[in-house]
């Protein structure tokens, strides 16, 4: 006897690629950007003509014209099966920090520069996206970080990051002093411009610019990258993703320190504060066109050499 699975309701969707069609699609983009608006208009028309219910993030909906259902990111997360982010990696990061708490897939259309997280071309997305919407896609889960600032033992601020959490001096560049602990075991003290704690996703971003190694996305690891350390022996270190990173700021530092999450959210840090960075329970479900190859992306985006023979 055959089993009849009802996939008509969005509630029944799975975190793996078992459902062949999406139902409700959310569009998210970079506000006040002409190229992004053009792509969003094409996407909205194309998806609507195919019978999908389409919701548009409220910051860009007003720029697309009338008869657009405008909602916030939380409603997109709650109602949609798929979110399409049009823009660069920064736009993807901003959306991902909100959408990771929901069970929906996220795919990107690149309207930025490198676009490590945005797979689809803006001028010819139809063919690849049609296959994705018909169930031909690869699913990849990326874990997030949770950063917390404690003062006198009390939690003062927290947020999540897809790429990295960075302890730095704030608006004025200067050396800061802090201690670093891994799972409550003292590792070292630092005199540096700051510290980057990065996920594998973020290893091709700020951490790479600071001399860190590239971690493949499937690794369950974190990389700690000191920023301009005042020593010749301090190098980036990779630790298990289950590790808890604690940074204790010296009381002798100035008062304008910050922890930045993906460069978007800034948490104020005072001398003597403790910063805890650990893996979040939230995961981003990235959707890629079938056959996505991470090393092809690296080779293309970073200008690596092609095959010799």
From Swiss-Prot:
Which reactions is this enzyme annotated as catalysing? NAD(+) + ATP = ADP + NADP(+) + H(+)
Q: What is its EC number?
A: 2.7.1.23
Per the record, its GO cellular-component terms are: cytoplasm
Q: Which cofactor does it need?
A: a divalent metal cation
Q: Which GO terms describe its biological process?
A: NAD metabolic process; NADP biosynthetic process
- What Pfam families has UniProt attached to this entry? NAD_kinase (PF01513), NAD_kinase_C (PF20143)
The UniProt annotation places NAD(+) binding at 89-90, 163-164, 174, 191, 193, 204-209
Q: Where is the active site?
A: 89 (proton acceptor)
Q: Which GO terms describe its molecular function?
A: ATP binding; metal ion binding; NAD binding; NAD+ kinase activity
Tell me where it resides. Cytoplasm
The answer to whether the entry has keyword Disulfide bond is: no
| Keywords, alphabetical | ATP-binding, Cytoplasm, Kinase, NAD, NADP, Nucleotide-binding, Transferase
Function (record text): Involved in the regulation of the intracellular balance of NAD and NADP, and is a key enzyme in the biosynthesis of NADP. Catalyzes specifically the phosphorylation on 2'-hydroxyl of the adenosine moiety of NAD to yield NADP.
The family classification in the record reads: Belongs to the NAD kinase family.
Q: What is this protein called?
A: NAD kinase
Species this chain originates from = Shewanella baltica (strain OS185)
């Amino acid at each position: 006897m055959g089993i009849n699975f009802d996939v008509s309701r969005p509630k029944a969707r799975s975190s793996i690629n078992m459902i062949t069609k999406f139902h409700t699609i959310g569009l998210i983009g970079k506000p006040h950007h002409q190229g992004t608006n053009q792509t969003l208009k094409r996407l909205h028309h194309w998806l609507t003509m195919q019978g999908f219910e389409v919701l548009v993030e409220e910051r860009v909906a007003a720029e697309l014209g009338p008869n657009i259902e405008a909602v916030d990111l939380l409603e997109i997360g709650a109602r949609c099966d798929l979110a399409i982010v049009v823009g660069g990696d920064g736009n993807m990061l901003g959306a991902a920090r909100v959408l990771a708490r929901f069970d929906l897939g996220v795919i990107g259309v690149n309207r930025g520069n490198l676009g490590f997280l945005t797979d689809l071309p803006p001028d010819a997305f139809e063919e690849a996206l049609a296959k994705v919407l018909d169930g031909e896609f690869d699913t990849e889960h990326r874990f997030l970080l949770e950063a917390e600032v404690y003062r006198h033992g009390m939690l003062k601020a927290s947020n999540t990051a897809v790429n990295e959490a960075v302890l730095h001096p704030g608006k004025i560049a200067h050396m800061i002093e802090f201690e670093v602990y891994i799972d409550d075991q003292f590792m070292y003290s630092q005199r540096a411009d700051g510290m980057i704690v990065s996920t594998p996703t973020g290893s091709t971003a700020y951490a790479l610019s600071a001399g860190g190694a590239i971690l493949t996305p499937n690794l369950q690891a974190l990389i700690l990258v000191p920023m301009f350390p005042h020593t010749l022996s301090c190098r980036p270190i990779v630790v298990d993703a289950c590790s808890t990173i604690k940074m204790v700021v010296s009381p002798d530092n100035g008062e304008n320190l910050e922890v930045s999450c993906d460069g978007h959210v800034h948490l104020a840090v005072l001398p003597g504060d403790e910063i805890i960075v650990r893996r979040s329970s939230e995961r981003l479900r990235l959707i890629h066109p079938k056959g996505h190859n991470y090393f092809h992306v690296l080779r293309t985006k970073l200008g690596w050499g092609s095959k010799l023979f």
